[in-house]
Amino acid sequence: MQDYNLGPDGYLDLIEGAKASVDIPVIASLNGVSPGGWAEYARLMEEAGADAIELNIYSIATEPTVSAVELEKGYVDLVRQIKRTVRVPVAVKLSPFFSAPANIALRLDDVGAGGLVLFNRFYQPDFDVESLEVVPRLTLSHPDELLLRLHWAAILTDHVEADLAITGGVHSATDVVKCILAGASVTMMASVLLQKGVQHAFSVLTDLRRWLEEHEYDSVRQMCGSMSRRSVPNPTAFERGNYMRVLSSYPLRAGHFNR
């Protein structure tokens, strides 16, 4: 992980080197909270060659005096400031923990966010019960995490102009298909590439092309959003009213509770 922790100047060099080495767009990730310094660093990323910037706002409100209104205003102000500083597209990596995700998504869309990334994965500390220390724990994503992202992509795609990206739980071509059907224009994967190697991406693309042919789609654009909340016959599948249907779908064995 030493190569990963490059520092600010090293990261700018990495962006410049990547831009010179590849023919695909280079999207730089910016971790920030306060508008001033981070907006300036966004400008330096653009100068280094970044084709777009993903703003990863990792803010944990540990102070009980900080209200949800203040926190959300900080997000919106930060995106507005960075949009005024750079000309390249800016995407925002969202947390799933907003009380009204659709509202904050719409507000970020209104101030110019070109993309919304669903969702950030916050790494939680663990307790070492022998040393009584708080220790970091890195856990790679699992396909089960995809369901929350599909849920909100299917809702948000009908309400925002920004492109949607899904990250967290994308491991296979089937996962990619689900993301696109929900309304995502972009799917991201990292954990499975760390586990299986970069060559796994080529297998996913091959399987995706096969699926498109078998289901007679000419392109991914044709299917994008075809299972959004507005597009499906039963929109309540994305709402609280679907709760009992989900529970009743679980197959209970005879005598399951008679023990």
What are these regions (language model features)?
Residues 125-142, 194-217:
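C-terminal helical cap(s) of enzyme catalytic domains, especially alpha/beta-barrels
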Residues 215-227:
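A glycine-biased, small/acidic residue-tolerant capping/turn segment at secondary-structure junctions
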Residues 193, 227-230:
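A short, acidic, flexible beta-alpha connecting loop/helix-capping segment that sits on the rim
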Residues 6-16, 20-27, 31-166, 171-187, ...:
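Alpha/beta enzyme core
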Residues 196, 231-234:
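A short beta-to-alpha transition loop/helix N-cap that caps and shapes the active-site region
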Residues 185, 210-214, 229:
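Short, well-ordered loop/turn and helix-capping segments at boundaries between secondary-structure elements
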Residues 1-2:
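Short glycine/proline- and acidic residue-enriched helix-loop micro-motifs
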